[in-house]
Amino acid sequence: MGFDTFEEIIRYAIEREKEAVDFYEEASRLEPYAWAKETFEGFAKEEQKHAALLEGFLKGEKSGV
């Protein structure tokens, strides 16, 4: 996989973060133990923050948020 621009790299990273959100949300839905469900939900929220940070980079925001 090759990238020609910084924007392509960031867009790729955003997609991977969104996939991670989906993964952790699905894991949370399937998890019978409350402590593990909460852990997966926390992971999903962190991945959402990462995606927002990267989207901010695309908008030219220095901090990304």
Task: Indicate residue ranges for each PLM-predicted region.
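Non-heme di-metal
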Residues: M1-V65
